[in-house]
From Swiss-Prot:
<feature type="binding site">
    <location>
        <position position="195"/>
    </location>
    <ligand>
        <name>NADP(+)</name>
    </ligand>
</feature>
<feature type="binding site">
    <location>
        <position position="236"/>
    </location>
    <ligand>
        <name>NADP(+)</name>
    </ligand>
</feature>
<dbReference type="GO" id="GO:0009086">
    <property type="term" value="P:methionine biosynthetic process"/>
</dbReference>
<keyword id="KW-0521">NADP</keyword>
<dbReference type="InterPro" id="IPR046346">
    <property type="entry name" value="Aminoacid_DH-like_N_sf"/>
</dbReference>
<feature type="binding site">
    <location>
        <begin position="168"/>
        <end position="170"/>
    </location>
    <ligand>
        <name>NADP(+)</name>
    </ligand>
</feature>
<dbReference type="GO" id="GO:0004477">
    <property type="term" value="F:methenyltetrahydrofolate cyclohydrolase activity"/>
</dbReference>
<dbReference type="InterPro" id="IPR020631">
    <property type="entry name" value="THF_DH/CycHdrlase_NAD-bd_dom"/>
</dbReference>
<keyword id="KW-0378">Hydrolase</keyword>
<dbReference type="InterPro" id="IPR036291">
    <property type="entry name" value="NAD(P)-bd_dom_sf"/>
</dbReference>
<comment type="subunit">
    <text>Homodimer.</text>
</comment>
<dbReference type="InterPro" id="IPR000672">
    <property type="entry name" value="THF_DH/CycHdrlase"/>
</dbReference>
<keyword id="KW-0486">Methionine biosynthesis</keyword>
<keyword id="KW-0511">Multifunctional enzyme</keyword>
<dbReference type="GO" id="GO:0004488">
    <property type="term" value="F:methylenetetrahydrofolate dehydrogenase (NADP+) activity"/>
</dbReference>
<dbReference type="Pfam" id="PF00763">
    <property type="entry name" value="THF_DHG_CYH"/>
</dbReference>
<keyword id="KW-0368">Histidine biosynthesis</keyword>
Length: 297
């Protein structure tokens, strides 16, 4: 029977550790603060941001909320970014994506103070990840790839020398997780597949580990999966459940594929909680660097 990689359980353990560390920082007079910048009133984005602030409350991190109307301009958002860059109460912050189409997302992300980049997506921080194949990285790491690796590590799943097929080349995970998987401490062999990849099913069948992040419901079918493979489902799609009479969230991996897998992450309940836990970890680690108590500082 396949091992279920329970992201909720592992994230809970991580948050318990973070809460202890935050309490230690508080005794030193430092309270980490996470800021969120939300533009518009998209229900999905609002729900996601609300979840982040609940996580903050759970571990003792202060919440700093900034919300702008959907009509906000790039300059309006940049003004908030500059304010958070200068705010000593804000240890790190995120820009909730996607932004409205009329806003220059690259300009916004590029204006973030790299040391306050809680998502680990600033060009400087991504560059540090490219440059440092081995050794400690003292800049924030991308949350979703970091969460995937932490989930696999929690279950003792070895990646060194194994073939990993990454489906999707989005900046959130597809283009960044390969950098983390090929670091000297991990040593996986990575194949990145995308819309231009021919015979994509063959790449999936050869993989020991499949990380699916294409956002297409049921993209990975049971006949595509090598028996015993590890399936990490990152994709998010909303489909109408006729039996329940409402929309529900599903992943990229068809549930029938779980029967042949050696291990799999459920969706929801797998990678999502881990991503949120890593966001908190980035904030706490930056606070520890500021306090001079983190070894990699």
């Amino acid at each position: 029977m396949a091992i279920v990689l329970d992201g909720k359980k592992v994230a809970g353990q991580i948050k318990a550790d973070l809460a202890s560390r935050v309490a230690g920082l508080a005794r030193m007079g430092m309270v980490p603060g996470l800021g969120t910048v939300l533009v518009g009133d998209d229900p999905g984005s609002m729900k996601y941001v609300e979840g982040k602030h609940r996580d903050c409350e759970e571990v003792g991190i202060a919440s700093i909320r900034r919300q702008l109307p959907a009509t906000a301009t790039t300059e309006d958002v940049l003004a908030v970014v500059r304010d958070l860059n200068e705010d000593p109460a804000c240890t790190g912050y995120i820009i909730q994506l996607p932004l409205p189409a009329h806003i220059d997302s690259n300009a916004i992300i590029g204006a973030i103070d790299p040391t306050k980049d809680a998502d680990g997506m600033h060009p400087y921080n991504l560059g540090e990840l490219v440059l440092h194949v081995r050794g400690d990285i003292t800049t924030p790491l991308p949350c979703t790839p970091r969460g995937v690796l932490a989930l696999l590590d929690a279950y003792g799943i070895e990646l060194a020398g194994r073939n990993v097929c990454v489906l999707g080349r989005g900046i959130t995970i597809g283009r960044t997780i390969g950098l983390m998987l090929t670091r000297s401490g991990v040593n996986a062999t990575v194949t990145l597949c995308h819309t231009g990849t021919r015979n994509i099913e063959e790449h999936i069948r050869r993989a020991d580990v499949v990380i699916a992040a294409v956002g297409v419901a049921g993209f990975v079918q049971v006949e595509h999966v090598k028996p015993g493979a590890v399936l990490i489902d990152v994709g998010v799609s909303r489909v109408f459940d006729e039996q329940a009479g409402r929309m529900r969230i599903v992943g990229d991996v068809d549930s029938e594929a779980h029967a042949v897998a050696g291990a799999y992450s459920p969706n929801p309940g797998g990678v999502g909680p881990m991503t949120r836990a890593m966001l908190l970890a980035n904030v706490v680690e930056q606070a520890e660097r500021m306090a001079g108590i983190r070894e990699d500082s």
